[in-house]
Structures are given as C-alpha cells and as structure tokens.
C-alpha cells in the first residue's frame, strides 16, 4: 500500500524458498509468545508452479498441537504475490499448509504480527 510503513515479520517457509511437490503441512515456527498486534498480515510470493492449482494457508496455535486458520491466500495457478490481513491476535506457533492438486510449488510465505 502506498505510504504504508515497513512491516517486520518472520519467514514461515523453509529457507529462501520452499518447494512442495504436493499438499504439505510445514513444521511450525515458534514465535516465543502469542501476540496481540493490531494488524497481522501474511505475505505470499509464488516463484513457480509446475502444474495444477494450489491454496496456501497460514495457521496458528497456542500449544503447537491444535491449529486454526489464520490467513488464506487466493488459489494460485502460476507466478503471483499477495498480501492478506488476518483478524485478531496470533498464537505463539505459526505454520504453512498447502492444499490442492498440484506439483512443484516454489514459494515463500512471511507473517507480520502487526
């Protein structure tokens, strides 16, 4: 958004890019504590998608056992990027889940607690 400040956050994907060959639940990232930021946001950058359609979701949890959906990106069929806002506070643990029928999704997801 023009005029918006910098949003600091954390990468939820492994390394500079992550490649999922099919639907995957990634390992969670421990943020150390729950946060009650005023405007949490998630960021998706799809570098490539070999075939199919993928949906990328960010989930959060207070105990690293029971996760709930925090943010859902628009389904992707190729190279794209998107920023979505998430309501309310976010749990201590965050993870990325990919779903759909696809092959070789190369992507990056970041999350800012606001």
Please give the residue ranges for each predicted region.
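Signature of extracytoplasmic/envelope-associated structural regions
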Residues: 1-114
């Amino acid at each position: 958004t023009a005029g918006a400040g910098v949003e600091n956050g954390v990468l939820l994907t492994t390394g500079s890019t992550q490649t999922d060959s099919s639907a995957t639940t990634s390992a969670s990232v421990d943020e150390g504590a729950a946060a009650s930021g005023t405007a949490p946001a998630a960021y998706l950058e799809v570098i490539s998608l070999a075939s199919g359609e993928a949906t990328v979701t960010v989930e959060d949890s207070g105990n690293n056992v029971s996760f709930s959906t925090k943010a859902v990106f628009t389904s992707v069929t190729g190279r794209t990027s998107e920023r979505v806002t998430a309501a309310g506070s976010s749990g201590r643990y965050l993870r990325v889940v990919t779903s759909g029928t696809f092959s070789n999704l190369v992507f990056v997801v970041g999350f800012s607690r606001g």
